[in-house]
Amino acid sequence: MKQKRYALIVAGGHGLRMGADRPKQFLLLAGLPVLMHTLNRFAPHVDAIVLVLPTDHHAYWQELCRKYDFSVSHRVVAGGNTRFASVRNGLQVVPDGVLVAVHDGVRPLVSAETIDACFDLAELKGAVAPCRPMTESLRYYATDGNYAVDRSRYVTVQTPQTFRSEWLREAYRQPYEEYFTDDCSVYEHHFGRPVALIVGNIENIKLTTPLDLSLAKLLLTS
């Protein structure tokens, strides 16, 4: 029997690198706030959506939902001071025995194929992340210089990173470490075992700079 599927959308950034007058998850993209595009992508594929937002963004989000008549069902949870704390808060309302996909709120171009592939493999493996092969040359910085490395041995990691909910919640009970950059690093540090990887869609970029936003507009309207 297929496990229920939850999306945990984390949207705690303030978008300083975007240089905008509001957090990047609320910037308009093809007529809708970025975050609404993200929730729309997940809605057909999950049984429930948990949205983690800073407390001081809740009223503004409610105002946007009214303004744009946004009707995708979701539960809003208060974020923490770090992404780690925000995910941990969100996991408190996700039950055991389900699959949970943790996704960056500012990745509005994740494909249906990527979402489904992460959930499907998580049914078998319990821990999955989408990734993309490296296309640029890589160099390693050291105290005595910098060195070329074999890029074929590296990938970039995307979200949604998808887990058995009870496993991820257990991993998030450990103390925070500075090198916890994503859910995979939290999971691997606690359990000492790797996650399975799938190839994510190339359009699944994280909107960080004005160039990213311009590219996302082109991809959505092309």
UniProtKB/Swiss-Prot annotation:
Mind telling me which residues the site (Transition state stabilizer) is annotated on?
A: R17, K24
- Name the chemical reaction catalysed here: 2-C-methyl-D-erythritol 4-phosphate + CTP + H(+) = 4-CDP-2-C-methyl-D-erythritol + diphosphate
Quick one: signal sequence residues? Answer: none
Q: Does the keyword Nucleotidyltransferase apply?
A: yes
Any coiled-coil regions, as ranges: none
Q: Quick one: which pathway?
A: Isoprenoid biosynthesis; isopentenyl diphosphate biosynthesis via DXP pathway; isopentenyl diphosphate from 1-deoxy-D-xylulose 5-phosphate: step 2/6
> What gene does this protein come from?
ispD
Q: What class of enzyme is it?
A: transferase
Q: Which CDD domains match?
A: CDP-ME_synthetase
The UniProt entry, under SUPFAM superfamilies, shows: Nucleotide-diphospho-sugar transferases (SSF53448)
The entry's protein name is 2-C-methyl-D-erythritol 4-phosphate cytidylyltransferase
Q: Which Gene3D superfamilies match?
A: Spore Coat Polysaccharide Biosynthesis Protein SpsA, Chain A
Q: Which NCBIfam families match?
A: PRK00155.2-3
Swiss-Prot/TrEMBL keywords: Isoprene biosynthesis, Nucleotidyltransferase, Transferase
Q: What is its EC number?
A: 2.7.7.60
Q: Does the keyword Transferase apply?
A: yes
Q: What does this protein do?
A: Catalyzes the formation of 4-diphosphocytidyl-2-C-methyl-D-erythritol from CTP and 2-C-methyl-D-erythritol 4-phosphate (MEP).
Molecular function (Gene Ontology), one example: 2-C-methyl-D-erythritol 4-phosphate cytidylyltransferase activity
Q: Kindly list the biological process annotations in GO that this record carries.
A: isopentenyl diphosphate biosynthetic process, methylerythritol 4-phosphate pathway
**InterPro entries for the chain:** IspD, IspD/TarI, IspD/TarI_cytidylyltransf_bact, Nucleotide-diphossugar_trans
Q: Where is this site: Positions MEP for the nucleophilic attack?
A: R151, K206
